[in-house]
Amino acid sequence: MKTVKDYIRTIPDFPEKGIMFRDVTSVIQDADGLKLAIDEMIKRLDGLDFDVIAGAESRGFVFGMPIAYALHKPFVMVRKAGKLPCETVSKTYDLEYGTATIEMHKDSVKPGQKVVLVDDLIATGGTMQAAAELVEELGGEVVKMLFLIELAGLNGRKLLSKYDVDAVVSYDGK
């Protein structure tokens, strides 16, 4: 029986020499791989009390939407700046070479709501830290951060240590 890890393609030396790129597209382009990935992520939410799934653009949408659908929960988009039409809250965070800004609609999370943040991959944790701060600014509580893949060598869990962080597959390197 195949595991999610069996569906993840590894591309050496991309985007630069010494990096082992973990390609999630090989998971979602295979019907069995996609179903297994979503099922494994849903299992990690079993018994958890939460109200909303929020996903980070763009692959957090890919995994968050089917989870929200399967569990009959609303889905909230965490988008790059300038992509949402209504009033937003925003957070700028550091990248390796510069900064990025993400936004959420001001009415997307209600005070007291329990939120699960979803993305395809955790590396340094910067995007999810910013997303969590947006949820908290809106009065929500982040009860879990859920990823398909973790690049443990980049220490994202350390940045997110105050949260419940879970990943289906973990790789030691970068």
Swiss-Prot record:
As for what it does, the entry says: Catalyzes a salvage reaction resulting in the formation of AMP, that is energically less costly than de novo synthesis.
**What InterPro entries does the record tag this protein with?**
Ade_phspho_trans, PRibTrfase_dom, PRTase-like, UPRTase/APRTase
| Compartments, as annotated in UniProt | Cytoplasm
Question: What's in the keyword line of the UniProt record?
Answer: Cytoplasm, Glycosyltransferase, Purine salvage, Transferase
Q: Which family does it belong to?
A: Belongs to the purine/pyrimidine phosphoribosyltransferase family.
Q: Which HAMAP family does the protein's record reference? A: Aden_phosphoribosyltr (MF_00004)
The entry's protein name is: Adenine phosphoribosyltransferase
| Biological or metabolic pathway of the protein | Purine metabolism; AMP biosynthesis via salvage pathway; AMP from adenine: step 1/1
One GO term of the cellular component aspect? cytoplasm
What is the top EC class of this enzyme, as a single word? transferase
Task: Please give the biological process terms from Gene Ontology that the record holds.
Answer: adenine salvage; AMP salvage; purine ribonucleoside salvage
Q: Which gene encodes it?
A: apt
**Assembly with partners or alone:** Homodimer.
Its EC number(s): 2.4.2.7
Supply the PANTHER family for this chain.
Answer: ADENINE PHOSPHORIBOSYLTRANSFERASE
One GO term in the molecular function aspect is:
AMP binding
| Keyword Cytoplasm carried by entry | yes
